[in-house]
């Protein structure tokens, strides 16, 4: 396979950095959809077959979109830099049905879990301290239902009793960088390079069931919940592999450090990883047996499970530069050009697997031409890259 490839096509709508991408494979739709958010508060719902927007929405005052999560029942949770988590309908009306204040002073996303009909749980950074976690429960029918279950949770004291490798100097875990969920367990990646997995039980206790130091002392940049494990990335050139089965049993014993319980069998830390041909990995996805990795330097690579490089994608910046000095300075301009990264920054990454779409309802389409286009699209897996210049590139895998 040629290691350098151009995109099959590019979606153009956003005028600013595409800060998050989210594929929606909804049972009522004839084909997968894509949601994109940008640095000026715009959200767009895309028809991937016709390659054009279905509808779009701009949040008042144009705050940067931090993260997107599809909840259920046609609701999209949107975190923005106005310190708000909004729940919007994606039926074209973009009606806001709920709003929660959330700390967005750091890089962290958020996590929403469904508890019951209309009831949800929110895990996010503490409103004042980005090194700790708040947990809320609420019902979408009432703004007054918002209840903070835990305030300012910190895990450092609970895990400080664990045996750390020689050379570790850990006096705190740092700010929360990333949240995700895997088989009901909540995972958070920390600035110190630790990944911590915990459960919430009925009596309000927090159970720590997993701890990894695989990226210490480098910060966690991304977490991806795959089919078999969770993958993590950092500023180093390795991908952390987090398998909860090696640290979890039917009913483990816990040591109490109220309100946090630490699993007694958790006497050692996980450090399973694979080295990859790229560093500063800001975004990570896995599609079937393919690993998608994007760096801070604007490169995206595709590898197989043996970390064999299969493809590399990048987008060049505009080479036109404006020099306001009327006399100019050829030497300084040449030095500046050489020192700058020629690639456009990757600001978001998403993947679409052909296997995830095999049960799609595209056969209900009565338009023969549309049905053929859907079939051709779903035959392939796709690497979808959002760039700092607002473009969204689609690469066939």
Swiss-Prot record:
Q: Where is the signal peptide?
A: none
- Its primary localisation, in coarse terms, equals nucleus
Query: What are the Low complexity biased-composition ranges?
Result: 332-356
Localization of this protein: Nucleus
InterPro entries from the UniProt entry: WD40/YVTN_repeat-like_dom_sf (IPR015943), WD40_repeat_dom_sf (IPR036322)
- WD repeat residue intervals: 16-56, 212-252
One GO cellular component term, please give it: nucleus
Q: Which UniProt keywords are listed?
A: Chromatin regulator, Nucleus, Repeat, WD repeat
Q: Where is this region: Disordered?
A: 324-356
Q: Name one GO biological process term.
A: chromatin organization
The transmembrane segments are none
- Asked if the record carries the keyword Repeat, the reply is yes
Indicate whether Ion transport appears among the record's keywords.
no
Protein family (similarity comment): Belongs to the WD repeat ASA1 family.
Q: What does this protein do?
A: Component of the ASTRA complex involved in chromatin remodeling.
Q: How does it assemble?
A: Component of the ASTRA chromatin remodeling machinery complex.
Q: What is this protein called?
A: ASTRA-associated protein 1
């Amino acid at each position: 396979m040629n290691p350098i490839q151009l995109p099959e096509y590019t979606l153009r709508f956003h005028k600013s950095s595409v800060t998050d991408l989210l594929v929606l494979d909804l049972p009522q739709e004839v084909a997968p959809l894509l949601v994109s958010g940008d640095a000026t508060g715009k959200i767009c719902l895309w028809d991937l077959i016709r390659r054009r927007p279905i509808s779009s929405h701009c949040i008042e005052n144009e705050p940067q979109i931090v993260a997107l999560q599809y909840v259920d029942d046609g609701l999209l949770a949107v975190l923005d830099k106005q310190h708000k988590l909004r729940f919007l309908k994606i039926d074209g009306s973009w009606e806001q049905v709920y709003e929660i204040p959330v700390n967005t002073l750091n890089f962290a996303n958020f996590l929403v879990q469904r508890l019951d009909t209309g009831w949800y749980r929110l895990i996010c950074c503490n409103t004042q301290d980005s090194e700790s976690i708040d947990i809320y429960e609420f019902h979408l029918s009432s703004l007054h239902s918002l209840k903070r279950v835990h305030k300012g949770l910190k895990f450092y004291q609970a895990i400080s009793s664990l045996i750390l490798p020689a050379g570790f100097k850990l006096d705190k875990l740092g700010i929360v960088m990333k949240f995700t969920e895997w088989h009901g367990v909540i995972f958070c990646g920390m600035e110190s390079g630790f990944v911590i997995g915990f459960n919430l039980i009925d009596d309000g206790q927090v159970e720590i069931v997993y701890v990894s130091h695989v990226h210490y002392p480098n910060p966690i940049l991304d977490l991806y919940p795959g089919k078999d494990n969770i993958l993590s990335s950092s500023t180093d050139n390795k991908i952390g592999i987090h398998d909860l089965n090696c640290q979890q049993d039917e009913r483990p014993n816990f040591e109490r450090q109220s309100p946090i319980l630490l699993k007694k069998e958790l006497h050692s830390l996980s450090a399973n990883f694979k080295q990859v041909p790229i560093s500063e990995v800001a975004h990570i996805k896995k599609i079937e047996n393919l690993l998608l990795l994007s760096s801070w330097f604007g490169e995206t690579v595709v590898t197989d499970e043996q970390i064999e490089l299969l493809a590399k994608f990048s987008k060049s910046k505009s080479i036109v530069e404006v020099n306001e000095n009327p006399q100019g300075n050829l030497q300084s301009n040449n030095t500046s050009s050489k020192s700058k990264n020629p690639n456009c920054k990757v600001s978001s990454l998403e993947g679409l697997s052909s296997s995830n779409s095999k049960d799609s309802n595209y056969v209900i389409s009565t338009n023969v031409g549309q049905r053929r286009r859907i079939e051709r699209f779903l035959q392939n897996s796709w690497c979808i890259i959002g760039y700092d210049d607002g473009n969204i590139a689609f690469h066939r895998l």
